[in-house]
From Swiss-Prot:
Domain of life: Eukaryota
Function: Component of the integrator complex, a multiprotein complex that terminates RNA polymerase II (Pol II) transcription in the promoter-proximal region of genes. The integrator complex provides a quality checkpoint during transcription elongation by driving premature transcription termination of transcripts that are unfavorably configured for transcriptional elongation: the complex terminates transcription by (1) catalyzing dephosphorylation of the C-terminal domain (CTD) of Pol II subunit Polr2A/Rbp1 and Spt5, and (2) degrading the exiting nascent RNA transcript via endonuclease activity.
Cellular component GO terms held in the UniProt record: cytoplasm; cytosol; INTAC complex; integrator complex; nuclear membrane; nucleus
Example of a GO biological process term: positive regulation of gene expression
Matches recorded under Pfam families: INTS5_C, INTS5_N
Biased composition (Basic and acidic residues): 571-583
Ranges that cross the membrane: 769-786, 810-826
InterPro entries, per database record: INTS5, INTS5_C, INTS5_N
Native source species: Drosophila melanogaster
Cell cycle recorded as keyword: no
Name of the protein: Integrator complex subunit 5
Molecular function via GO: DNA binding
Family under the similarity heading: Belongs to the Integrator subunit 5 family.
Bilayer topology annotation: Multi-pass membrane protein
Amino acid sequence: MLRQNLLDQLKHFIETVSNGHSCPQLLTSPNLIKLALGFLEELPATRDIVFEYFALLAEISVQLYVSPEMADPKTGMPVSQVKLAGNRQQQQRAPEYEAFNLVKTALQSLVWKGPPAWSPLIANWSLELVAKLSDKYTQRRMTITASCNYWLECSAMHGLMTLINSCFRKLTQPEEEACVEIMLNAFHRFPMTFDWIVARLGGCFPYKIIMQILQCGIKRFVDDYRCHLDSEAGILDYMTSCHEQHLRAAFREMLREGFAPKKPLDVAVVPFLLITTNYSDTILQSLVNVLVEIYTEDMCEVIVQKAPLWLSNKMFAGMQPTLNNAVLRLNERGATLLLTAAKMAEKYVWCQDFLDNSMQELEQWVLNQRNFPLLADLAYEETKYMLWKSCLSTNLFEQQTAVRLLLVVSSQHPNIYYQTISQLLKKSYAQNPNGIGALIRLLGGQSGMVNFPGFTPGFKMVLEDITLDVQVNNRLPVPPGTPTEAFNTFSNLNILARMHKSKNVAPYIKAQHLNQALNECLPKILQIFDCTVNKLVLRIDRDAAERIADKFRAQQSKNSNNNNELCNGKDYGKRTKLEPGEDKVDDEDATRMRLAHLIVDLLNNIEAGSRTTVLRTPLVLKLATLSVKYFFVGLTEKTVIRRAAASHRSYTLLQRQCSARKIARTVCLRELVERALFYHGHLLGQLEVYQLDELEIPEHEHLILQNLHTSSGANSNRSVLHSGIIGRGLRPVLPPSERNCDAEKQALYLKALNACCADLEKPNNVEGYSLVSLLLVELVSTDVMYNGLPFPDEEFTRVTMERDMLIRRAFINSPVLWAVLGLIAGHRPALCYSSVLLRALCATCLHHWRGKNVNRFQPTAANDELMLCTKKMLQLLAMSQLIPPPLTNLHLIIEHFESAEIALLLRECIWNYLKDHVPSPALFHVDNNGLHWRNTNTQLAKVPPQYVDPLRHLMQRKLSTLGPHYHQMFIMGELMEGDSEPDPTARLQIVEID
């Protein structure tokens, strides 16, 4: 009975399906669907009929999906039936559209819960059905992504794809191979419409599908090289999004076969892969990634050997323009590919052609302001560092390629341009001089671009980094002698500045732009210069203090009778010959010194402080102060040549500033004089005085312990009147000063003063020297009163005796004062403004010679300090024409007179003459050459006899000794009276007082 019932139901099912083609409502009846599903379990022989019915249901659903009524009137895209609610006809079609969902649910349950044999059967049926429906109802060619989005919106197609995916998970290895074969066969039959199915289902067997697709493409390519590979490329492109590693593995395997061909198809592997990259940027990117990973130098030789085989393919022979364009489509490894080709360009001409074509097209895209994927690759941090490294390469092709790529990316990312300038400026090009060419080419910018970023921010960036590095004293430890980044930067900037001055950078860098950029960075340069020079100055002062302290301790040890008590049984305060870390300090100081020299060279090359540059007043003052500090730092160089070189650098810097601005001249002169007298006098032979702490009380010593050093002795004159220190013993006997007046350093110092005072436009201008004279009065004289030009009566010197003695002490301690006065004396009438100093010297010498008259038999040594002071003073007066002939020769014969006679001459001849003839600039007139001159040979300027007769009478007593001088001074002078006034033709610029 049950058997008969099944047969009746089968008959009814066949009749209904046969007669229901014109009535979809009848075919999509839920009862009929349930009846068909029952046949699968109860009547396996009806399986083919049932699956045909299921295919019919799927086709009905697809027909409803692609019908015009299912299209959105606004977008034209199909709309899911279940989402429609306004159209009655569409509402009636909804059950038919969703009918296949019942089939999908039942078949999926059968796959998961039924026998394993159902999985391959349902999978094969679903693949065939999807292929037929897709091919039949595809109305236009679409991309794989668009096809997936289009068909997966259809309920039936989505259900079939779900079934296939479920079946694939239950298949065994042989069954998988069979399903893949069916899928590829369907792809061969429907290559234009089945590609999206392969791409969608390829995730189940990614590597197999990818390899099979590639093999199919190679076969088609070998049969017809003009064939289109859109489907194959589309499948690979779609699968790359989730299975890129499998695609790379497939490419790696195929390239291995292509570079070592064993089969006829292997020869076409490389041309096929390169052709495939034209269809998809994703495939191109994956292939390039694989090539970069497996590339070796040996592979290059293989490529050259196999190239004739590949060129036999007509399409590959003419695809170089396509390859050039391919580089611009890379999101990654594009720069690596170009640099690799650049490294090979020296050996292979085709690499040069590839580079030229690629870079020209790349730059053309930039000029046209077109965006391309390679820009993203160039902007990556890793790529940026790789390009910076290539800029330092000795391979010129690699270097210039890296520079051009950096210029390309800099047009869109200015920060990379600034960072690149900063990095290249910090590098040393001593071993690779051609490396500076990359920096020069980079500063030239991208030709043809109007709004290309300037390089001034790049200079400021590197100077900011150097400022931090200099301030923290080299954050990273470096081996001794290694050039620092600061040294390299200023060395490179000097090279650029010198090229700018010699007009050798014209093809690349606009000279005015370079000079303007460096002058804009002047505040940063001065900040670095300030930090560097100040550290050197501190080191100089510290060394001087330690040297003085060592000398004092050594003498103290010799003079003390109780050395052990003084030092508390220890070598207190003594330094070892080489303290730990002293070598490191010396290396750091040497590095700073070299850096200071480079900075000054740069300032001279860019003509910092000249009239053509506009500087704010604080910068002018800072530059002037640092220039003077650098001069004194340069005097500490170890050799004469280095000192001279440093001094000449400072002369150029000082002279340019002082000629341009009066405020700079004032500051420079004040700093030069003040530092020579109070801060760095030890460099110029100044007497070094140790600041002695006589009590030497320890900082944490209690008062009760301090009192133990003292005791109450007998109240006698021998215990009360003593020359020692209570509790410390006798004062040490200091040795006589052993001053070494370095003539070389004094000459350099005088040249520095002369550089500040000299006016190139007005050579005879003495304004600067007059300013030095006034500064000496301000800094040496301790009293603001009685600093005028006139000489008072000799009795008045008792009022200013203390000040005069202090001024005399200043000349004793600082011998350079004599040299400075000698320089001033040669530029008349500047010495007149130092009248108070001359008055103090004359007064003290007069009183001292008068005091020596107490013991008239005491001989005067030739090098006695008083005699030397007197001779120098008289020589200054003669050079400056403040005293007339024959008194101008007095310094030559003064040593032949006794103390009383010298005192007489100083009072009657010198002091009285200067008292009656005030040393004023009004005494001098300007001759035709612009020189200030005092004519003393005319009748009106004849010296009255009261100033000359004392000298005449004293010389007459000693004619045996002073006869030649007497003849020259008096007899010859009287014979020459009435002659024309002398015509001075030269002037002493630097005069050293003997």
